[in-house]
């Protein structure tokens, strides 16, 4: 049996899902965390990758489990986020994915207390480093950064 002497970080996938609104604007899909760390705070849908799935499959699974949202089209890989202290549970690297869908009803499931669309100018404070991830997504998708008044 092969022995691997190097420590292994945890790997997660997070989803930045923008909802196209009827008024021509966009909203961001967030979940209220039901468990620690950051219990009760809002976060991007996402979670830990299982050994038998790809990162994109992980992103799709977590998104559907936590919000009921099943993205039919492509998920764009946004990038990896690997700050050493980004997760208090231990060394965790996330790969973020992005999609744009029509805004539709969502509901919290699995370890998410609730799921909700937030107008981009009314984002709550976000758990982990999700403010940074959202800022990268906004810049990539819309060419705009997150205004200072949003997402502490």
Model-derived features with residue positions:
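Unchanged
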Residues: 49-146
